[in-house]
């Protein structure tokens, strides 16, 4: 909840389920013992990110074609140091090694140029209404 508005943030219970189903798809950065940034998301054969995916960790398919990114999170005090970018690069590298078709995430308008720097292409407004927000679907095809 420190990284996202309450309506958009995953609950502790949702994170527990995510860790249970796809712990290998969390990219973490620590400062000493403190978690300061992380990226997470599951793998699926579905090419588009849906609201259902945020809520149902059990939809993870380890052999799926697409790495979804549900959150790029950095605590406010550690933002603008490149930590999120490092984790995004690690997620991209892992997806390549695993033979995925690519990665998909959604973001608000102001972040489209940020994700474009990593090779993500804006595919237009997403069907997702997660947190009652308009999201752009971004895709990086490998």
Q: Where are the predicted features?
A:
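Conserved G/P- and acidic residue-centered "switch" motifs that form tight phosphate/ATP-binding loops
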Residues: 82
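Conserved GNAT acetyl-CoA-binding A-motif
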Residues: 88, 93-108
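Active-site rim helix/loop that mediates acceptor-substrate recognition in acyltransferases
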Residues: 5-32, 36-59
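Conserved acyl-donor/pantetheine-binding loop and adjacent beta-alpha core of acyl/acetyltransferases
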Residues: 38-73, 79, 89, 128-135
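Conserved acetyl-CoA-binding loop of GNAT-fold acetyltransferases
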Residues: 116-126
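A short, well-structured alpha-helix characteristic of acyl/acetyltransferase catalytic modules
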Residues: 1-2
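C-terminal "cap" of GNAT-fold acetyltransferases
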Residues: 108-109, 124-142
